[in-house]
Amino acid sequence: MSNQHILLMSNLLPVGSNISTWWNFGSMLLTCLLLQIMTGFFLAIHYTANINLAFSSVVHILRDVPYGWIMQNIHAIGASLFFICIYIHIARGLYYGLYLNKEVWLSGTALLITLMATAFFGYVLPWGQMSFLAATVITNLLTAIPYLGNTLTIWLWGGFSINDPTLTRFFALHFILPFAIISLSSIHIILLHNEGSNNPLGTNSDIDKIPLHPYHSYKDMLMITIMITMLFITMSFTPNLLNDPENFSKANPLLTPQHIKPEWYFLFAYGILRSIPNKLGGTMALIMSVAILITVPFTHTSHTRSMLFRPLTQILFWTLISTFIIITWTATKPVESPFISISQMTSIIYFSFFIINPLLGWIENKIMMP
């Protein structure tokens, strides 16, 4: 039995002493997941998955159900917090080279894809105008698949258009996928603690480890408290800050807003989709915008794990973050000049990161060890 397992048995999870606040987002994500499951359960009790009643049932939850407005707002704002935490969590993994723990990184990528699917299904459920159009646009992308596209789309819709069967199955999927997220999270954590967490230096932590409790657990509690405080402040003062005004109208297939946009946390992928004037090409780019994370562990060329001592790669990393923000911003704008060209340029820069990064690693190796 290894030293790590002996310490685990005596309730002392060994963790590197120098891990920073960026390592707290895992526990914050777990808190978000628990919040979402609890509030989601209470919302599901009162929700009706029927196109004629769904919108009214959400209004009923907000107006008539005791504390229903709290449940609904925590669930809606909690989803945004969930994505803020997960994007920071992924950025931390990219910056400090944590993707070299391949099993953890790949299980995390699977988690991200499952989470995005769950959030998309959840966005459709209130059956507001933007919910309906987001569902129409995204599910319609299946038709881009050669030969099978139309059949798959009709199969997913449960008919020849988005209708009652579509809403029912989306509700069923939105209910069941969080349990898949719990399972994947467990696998993610088990795989992580198989080797132990890394640290900002990217070196082996074995020589300097301290127990998780009380040293790091109190730090976790502080960040969780700050996050929940932010959640309650937003819920109390600006509960509709992140909602689309179009979604306050019941879905009407005969009306189309000026431009369709999903929730803010999908805007970067939607912006990439929109920047390519071809249905199949756009769909492929949309999938690759997330799936490209799978390639990162296999294209690492630098002798140094962390970006902490790699100034050239740091510039590239912060370019990626800026690009992510710019794509998100352009996706909120109508499809017109100059937003089309900005989207296209930033999309190219976004994907370039994953090509230039291994080349820069190789160049830095030559500079450090000529």
Curated annotation (Swiss-Prot):
Miscellaneous information on this protein = Heme 1 (or BL or b562) is low-potential and absorbs at about 562 nm, and heme 2 (or BH or b566) is high-potential and absorbs at about 566 nm.
Q: Name one GO molecular function term.
A: ubiquinol-cytochrome-c reductase activity
Q: How does it assemble?
A: The cytochrome bc1 complex contains 3 respiratory subunits (MT-CYB, CYC1 and UQCRFS1), 2 core proteins (UQCRC1 and UQCRC2) and probably 6 low-molecular weight proteins.
Keyword annotations for this protein, in alphabetical order, are:
Electron transport, Heme, Iron, Membrane, Metal-binding, Mitochondrion, Mitochondrion inner membrane, Respiratory chain, Transmembrane, Transmembrane helix, Transport, Ubiquinone
Family the entry assigns: Belongs to the cytochrome b family.
Which cellular component terms (GO) are annotated to the entry? mitochondrial inner membrane; respiratory chain complex III
Q: How does it sit in the membrane?
A: Multi-pass membrane protein
Give the cofactor note: Binds 2 heme b groups non-covalently.
- Entry function: Component of the ubiquinol-cytochrome c reductase complex (complex III or cytochrome b-c1 complex) that is part of the mitochondrial respiratory chain. The b-c1 complex mediates electron transfer from ubiquinol to cytochrome c. Contributes to the generation of a proton gradient across the mitochondrial membrane that is then used for ATP synthesis.
Cellular location of this protein?
Mitochondrion inner membrane
Q: Where is a ubiquinone annotated to bind?
A: 193
Necessary cofactors: heme b
Enumerate the residues binding heme b b566. Answer: 89, 188
- What biological-process terms (Gene Ontology) are attached? mitochondrial electron transport, ubiquinol to cytochrome c
Q: What is this protein called?
A: Cytochrome b
User: Where does the chain cross the membrane?
Assistant: 25-45, 69-90, 105-125, 170-190, 218-238, 280-300, 312-332, 339-358
Residues annotated as binding heme b b562 = 75, 174
